[in-house]
Amino acid sequence: GTRYHTAVQLDVGLLLSMHLTSQGDITATGLQPAVYEEQVRQRRRGVRLDEDVRLHNGQRVARPAGVQDAASQFVELSHRLATGQLSTEPGTAIPLWLARPGGVDEWTYDVVGEDTLHLPRLGAVRALHFRPRPLAKPRGPIHAEIWFAPSLQYLPVRIRITQGPDTFMDLLADTIEQQ
């Protein structure tokens, strides 16, 4: 099988430093994460995904089919969109299991619709807006809305990370590099 490695890095000066990494296998059904690590500020936490999921505290929980992690979800959703596995109709609900250091939860993203984003270097870009539903048992106030650009192989061009009613980061793609 073929392996993958993906990383998401955010550095907002002294306010926040966040680094997410995911490694695993590329299979016929999509990405299959094996190791996920996140470092927020100086705190490093991780998850191991084998037959089951080993959380940061050592607890083992069942591994749902197709489970992703906080970094691999962006690549997996882009792939599913680009290959026509997901509907882009507004109102479509897209379920996705996510493994994070504190637990495994089923997230549901709603396709909100299509927006035209004005990106600093890329100009006007049409993008599909995905919004997560609140979790039944939230592990914290953080959630991420994602905009995927059909003209850029459905890569995410905007991610809005919200932590509570008044705190958010709005991340816009500056350049798109593919390897």
Report residues per predicted region.
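Acidic, serine/threonine-rich low-complexity disordered tracts
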Residues: 1-51, 90-179
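Hydrophobic, well-structured mid-protein blocks that either form specific transmembrane helices
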Residues: 45-87
